[in-house]
Amino acid sequence: MRLASSQGATLLAAELAPADYAEVESRDLLSPYAAGVYWLTLGEQRMALLISAPSSTPWIEQSSAADLTIRFPATPSGCASSLARWQFFDQNFTLLHSQTVNRDQHPAPPIAPSQARWRSLSVIQSEYQGTIRVEQMQRLTIPID
């Protein structure tokens, strides 16, 4: 699998075992990819993906150590609603627990597992381009006191 910019620069590459489903994540980025056309190559198949401009409004804001605000992005026509998810990690960033946030409630974190050292809140927006699901995510990860 290879994802390349319109100029041909490799942005993401991975060896995938033959399967009906595969998932590949980019490294955490300090800045998002630019909007535009990208090329995804899966085996002998090459397809264009249109990546939209990232939101100029943060989806997650922290006003104090305990107070977080979620601004769910608008849902494009024909797409699933965005979702938010709490995750807890140990000191090695091994996932300990994950829980989806109810969109109608304040995003207060659930009780952290005793060995948790980090908590993370993510807002994820998904869209399909053919059979390919493209996710854009904003994440805030903070230490647990």
Q: What label would you give each PLM region?
A:
Residues 1-11, 80-98:
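Extended low-complexity, serine/threonine- and proline-enriched intrinsically disordered segments
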Residues 34-44, 114-138:
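Short, aromatic- and glycine-rich surface loops/edge beta-strands on solvent-exposed regions
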Residues 51-74, 142-145:
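Low-complexity, Pro/Ser/Thr- and charge-rich linker/hinge segments at domain boundaries
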Residues 10-28, 102-110:
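Aromatic sugar-binding surface patches on proteins
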Residues 91-119:
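Long, low-complexity serine/threonine/glycine- and acidic-rich segments characteristic of extracellular
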Residues 13-14, 45-55, 127-145:
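Edge beta-strands of extracellular beta-sandwich domains
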Residues 24-33, 48-52:
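Beta-sandwich interaction modules
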Residues 20-22, 31-33, 63-65, 79, ...:
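Surface-exposed coil/turn segments at beta-strand junctions on protein surfaces, enriched
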